[in-house]
Amino acid sequence: MERLTVTLGERSYPITIAAGLFNDPASFLPLKSGDQAMLVTNETLAPLYLDTVRSVLEQAGVNVDSVILPDGEQYKSLAVMDTVFTALLQKPHGRDTTLVALGGGVIGDLTGFAAASYQRGVRFIQVPTTLLSQVDSSVGGKTAVNHPLGKNMIGAFWQPVSVVVDLNCLKTLPARELASGLAEVIKYGVILDGEFFSWLENNIDALLALDEKAMAYCIRRCCELKAEVVAADERETGLRALLNLGHTFGHAIEAEMGYGNWLHGEAVAAGMVMAAHTSERLGQFRAQDTQRIIDLLKRAGLPVRGPQEMSAQAYLPHMMRDKKVLAGDMRLVLPLAIGSSELRGGVPHDVVLGAIADTQQAQQ
């Protein structure tokens, strides 16, 4: 079992990583006998895990209700979140309830925002079931829903009280979803840890084969890196923005193509290549390092260019609505070397457009 802590003073919380956690009531602490909980999951995951998690909580004496939402990024909306509020009010659940987010990034983000909003804030536990949510979105307290004009534009910072990572969930994960999660894994190596990036180059096949030892180390290292960043910059005033490498380009792809048509990790993968080409054009990143990123993404089964039907100009309106934009200045996370990155403002639009063109036209 791997266990680490996100250190945020009184709001610190544990991350527990192991196979078989769903069978142990202690995994879901601080829930205890007599507590009330609302399990939030989706139609795909409910047949796989809902009864197991409900049963282990009920064995611990927790009073459990559940709400099952439709599955997909397109349902990460205010309208669907209202379904959660209705379920909470109908039971009813008070301010002492705990929401349990049983799912991937969509369920985690939506449930977290519902927890932040319901009766001005209730506890919630993250139980991430996808690799992407296990290494990234479940840690750090960013919660949100999408708006037709932008991804994650309506939300709040609201930390969970615990993160429960059961490695067995990855056994039911479609290959495309596994690859999507590996995009965020690779991102950590690019922005923060060159040694981890090299480890990934040597172990990507083991991760794709769901080798338990390799996967446990991978998830722990990603969570360690994110926990360090969140502890230093919870509200994303500086350092935490580095975790958005590839996301400004990637969110543009997701919004333009329609939420759910490109998985988040797929869009981020293409966005990382665009960010690398942008940094190359600014003279601060080596072409051979861009190629290392491309090669690793391809080995992980990820796209290394954006949609062919999306012009370079189509990116800019979406990118100018990015949350990192300040006073009309598009700020981008750019790699400086494998394991080092910066948040840079004042990047000329012609450089960005050229980098997108480089990505789309390259013989990769």
Swiss-Prot record:
UniProt keyword list: Amino-acid biosynthesis, Aromatic amino acid biosynthesis, Cobalt, Cytoplasm, Lyase, Metal-binding, NAD, Nucleotide-binding, Zinc
Residues bound to NAD(+) are 71-76, 105-109, 129-130, 142, 151, 169-172
Q: Does the keyword Lyase apply?
A: yes
> What's one GO-annotated cellular component?
cytoplasm
List the pathway annotation: Metabolic intermediate biosynthesis; chorismate biosynthesis; chorismate from D-erythrose 4-phosphate and phosphoenolpyruvate: step 2/7
Q: Which GO terms describe its molecular function?
A: 3-dehydroquinate synthase activity; metal ion binding; nucleotide binding
Q: Does the keyword Nucleotide-binding apply?
A: yes
Q: How is the cofactor bound?
A: Binds 1 divalent metal cation per subunit. Can use either Co(2+) or Zn(2+).
Which positions in this protein are listed as binding Zn(2+)?
E184, H247, H264
**EC number(s) per entry:** 4.2.3.4
Subcellular location, in the record's words? Cytoplasm
Task: Please give the cofactor(s) recorded in the UniProt entry for this protein.
Answer: Co(2+); Zn(2+); NAD(+)
EC class name? lyase
As for family, the record states: Belongs to the sugar phosphate cyclases superfamily. Dehydroquinate synthase family.
Q: What is this protein called?
A: 3-dehydroquinate synthase
Organism the protein comes from: Klebsiella pneumoniae (strain 342)
